[in-house]
Regions:
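Gram-negative bacterial Sec-dependent N-terminal signal peptides
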Residues: 2-27
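Immediate post-signal peptide segment of exported/extracytoplasmic ligand-binding proteins
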Residues: 31-44, 114, 215
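N-terminal lobe/hinge region of extracytoplasmic solute-binding protein
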Residues: 46-96, 126, 212-219
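Hydrophobic residues in beta-strands and at strand termini
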Residues: 47, 94, 103-105, 166, ...
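Extracytoplasmic/secreted proteins, especially bacterial periplasmic and envelope-associated proteins
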Residues: 66-70, 83, 87, 103, ...
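Sec-exported extracytoplasmic/periplasmic mature domains
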Residues: 72, 76-80, 97, 105, ...
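Aromatic- and charge-enriched surface segment that lines or borders ligand/interaction sites
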Residues: 91-139, 173
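Gly/Pro-rich hinge or "lid" segments in bacterial periplasmic/extracellular proteins
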Residues: 150-151, 155, 169-170, 175-223
Length: 223
């Protein structure tokens, strides 16, 4: 990815073959009546600065955040009015604002066809707070109140002690240190987006390169 290419724009190709899996019909874009769509659906986003990384936990500014939202999808999204709407999670529940249960879509897919599961979120959130990963956004897990995040970030506990678990492939349980009534809205933050464990472990620091990156968003990296 050259600086010259970045100045022209950052090209993302629509996951046409997997769009039905990437987004449920309820989440599909609403096209205004009378609007003619181009045969080739793609977005070319011009950004001022080259992104430091396409890894959600390495994002440090607006360029990375914009691209992360194109390439990945979290538990929830926000509509044009800022209202929380389903993302990978179809619904959620809590009785005390301290323990949250999220129920995931069974048709959610990574761009390589693998299913997106609750275990992907467990891995990704643990990866966020793992001190060795030096995430500039690790503090967000602490801000969100996820159980043990502070102790893990400071190196006092291992990452697998984070208050997140997967009772089954499509159920995610989150335990907080204290009640946080607005926690669901916080999961729309890019730092809590899932990543594909197999791809990250296979390619290491090169997992975000063109040809390697696997996302679960509406768009995939092309060049």
């Amino acid at each position: 990815m050259t600086g010259k290419k970045m100045q022209r724009g950052f090209r993302l190709a629509l996951c046409a073959a997997a769009i039905g899996a990437c987004m449920s019909s309820a989440m599909a874009a609403q096209v205004p009546p009378g609007t003619a769509l181009a045969d080739k659906q793609e977005i070319v986003r011009h950004i001022k600065d080259e992104p430091a990384s396409l890894d959600p936990i390495k994002a440090v500014g607006l360029p990375e955040a914009q691209l992360a939202r194109d390439l990945f999808e979290g538990l929830v999204n926000q509509d044009a009015n800022g209202k929380v709407i389903p993302g990978v999670a179809t619904r959620w529940q809590t009785s005390d604002n301290q323990t949250y249960i999220f129920y995931l879509r069974k048709d959610a897919r990574w761009s390589n066809g693998d299913p997106v599961t609750a275990k992907d979120f467990v891995y990704s959130w643990q990866r966020l707070v793992e001190p060795k990963n030096l995430s500039p956004f690790a503090w967000f897990a602490q801000l969100a109140g996820i159980q043990n995040a502070e102790q893990i970030i400071s190196g006092k506990l291992p990452a697998d002690r984070l208050g997140v678990s997967a009772p089954d492939d499509y159920t995610l349980k989150v335990q907080l240190d204290k009640p946080v009534p607005y926690f669901v809205s916080l999961t729309a933050n890019f730092s809590l987006f899932p990543v594909n464990k197999a791809v990250v472990e296979k390619y290491g620091n090169d997992w975000t390169k063109v040809g390697n990156l696997v996302g679960n968003g509406a768009f995939k990296l092309q060049e």
